[in-house]
Each structure stands twice: as structure tokens, then as C-alpha cells.
Amino acid sequence: MDIVKNYLIAFDQYTANFRWESGVTPLSSYVFPFSTSVIYVLVIFALQAIMKNKKGMVLKGFSIIHNINLIILSFSMMSGVMYAAYQQYLEQGAFSLVCEQSSQSVQGRIGFWIYIFYLSKYYELVDTVILALKKKPIIFLHIFHHMAMVPVTWQWLHDQWLVGSWWCTLVNSFIHVLMYYYYLQTTLGNPCWFKKYITKAQIVQFLTGTAMVSYWFVIRDSEKCQAPLSPAIVSNTINSFFIILFGKFYYDSYKSNSRRQEKLNKVE
């Protein structure tokens, strides 16, 4: 028990001392997120072309490991940023979580977990590679979501924008625990009843994020929040696209199907 306790204390101290430095911290240069997004799209289109006349791969074992990895990683990020936000609340007050108190607000514990969240977006690109190799349908929403999140999360750190970043890290990680658990169960061939609730939760995430950022816009000047406007504008713009795209996906996947079934029942 002492070993575990000492490890946790040492790890907490390490995260408390975390510092994001543009051009110094690994993958902190703008070249990495933007080039990755372009390469990601090209690779997916290339894989689809290569697999066009081939049989889709099974990849069951790899998919199981991949989903388990992301369940563990997502749970760790959710727990980590929740603890970091709580510690900041104790040290600086709740208002520090909705209005940056300095130009270096995404540092220390909370900065560490937002950085891990940023890195996780690179790993999540493997989701699409698996779909392409399996010859599964890949919708625009999926590609746009994965492509956009790498540069968006990089900008949070680069511009030291705290408000939307810690909240998105917390809520998105929670949703991804459920989502990758669902993917794991479907890979194992087990039924999973809550698929549509994951999409609902994602829409709620974007709505709450948009509301939080909109509040930040209102108080930014009067409260002298120490962060630039650009990451907030980008995040709310991306959130608006996500709300529309996820809303359409939910309607097409669930509402339109239920209405078609109702019509069939009436005919019968």
C-alpha cells in the first residue's frame, strides 16, 4: 500500500509541475496537428481505394485491445481532469474555471490532463483506420469529427484557453468510456442497449459546451479573463457544426427509422 501511495503522490507532484511550452513540449508545434489532419484524410481515402476490391479484414483481436485501451485512457482522463478541476476550485475558487486568471491558465494538473486529451486525439484516428480496413461505412461526421479535434485541442493549449477545454475533456472522456465500451461489446458480439443515448449525450456535451463558452464571451471583458478570443470562436463554430451533424445523425438513425416502422405498422 505504501508503494501505491508513494507512486500516487509522486505522480500528482509530476502533474502539478507540468508546463506546456510551445515548440518545446512534444507535438506542441502547429505543424503536427494540421499536417496530421491532412495526412489522416489522405490515408483514409487511400485505404478505401486499396480495399475497394478486397475482402474486409476481421481485426477482432486488435479491435478488442484498441477499445480496452481507450476505455482505460478515457476513464483516466475523466478522473484526472475532475481531480485537477477540484484542486483548482480549492486553491483558486470556482470562478477560475470559467474565467482565466492568468495568461498561463492551462498548466499544472489541469494542463497535464488537457495535454493527454490532446494526445489521445491522435490515437483515436486509429478508429477510422479500423473501419476502412474492415470495409465498414465511414460517414462524413466521423471523418470531420476526428480531423477537427486534433488541431482544436492543440489550440486550447497553444492559446492557454481553459474554459471550454477542461469541460470538454471531462464530458467527452466520460462519453468515450461509454462509447468504447459499446464498441467493445459489439466487437465481442454482445447486445448493447444504450447506443442512441451515447449520441444524445454527445449532443448535450456540445450544447453545454456552447453555453459555457457563450457565458465566457459575455464576462470576458468585464472580468478581464486572460485568454484570447480565437479559441473560443473556433470552438463554438465547431460545436455548432457538431450539433447540426450529430442531430442529423440521431434523426436519420433513430427518429426516421421509428416513423418508417410506424407507417409499416399502420399498413399491416
From Swiss-Prot:
GO biological process: fatty acid elongation, monounsaturated fatty acid; fatty acid elongation, polyunsaturated fatty acid; fatty acid elongation, saturated fatty acid; sphingolipid biosynthetic process; very long-chain fatty acid biosynthetic process
Gene Ontology cellular component annotations, sorted alphabetically: endoplasmic reticulum membrane
Superkingdom: Eukaryota
GO molecular-function terms, A-Z: fatty acid elongase activity
Induction entry: By STATa.
Membrane topology: Multi-pass membrane protein
EC number: 2.3.1.199
Enzyme class: transferase
Presence of keyword Lipid biosynthesis: yes
Keywords from the named record: Fatty acid biosynthesis, Fatty acid metabolism, Lipid biosynthesis, Lipid metabolism, Membrane, Transferase, Transmembrane, Transmembrane helix
Coarse class of the protein's main subcellular location: membrane
Localization per record: Membrane
Catalytic activity entry: a very-long-chain acyl-CoA + malonyl-CoA + H(+) = a very-long-chain 3-oxoacyl-CoA + CO2 + CoA
Transmembrane segments: 31-51, 62-82, 110-130, 137-157, 161-181, 198-218, 227-247
The keyword Transmembrane appears for this protein: yes
Disulfide bond positions: none
Xref: Pfam families: ELO
Family: Belongs to the ELO family.
Cited function: Could be implicated in synthesis of very long chain fatty acids.
Name under which the protein is recorded: Fatty acid elongase sre1
Organism field: Dictyostelium discoideum (Social amoeba)
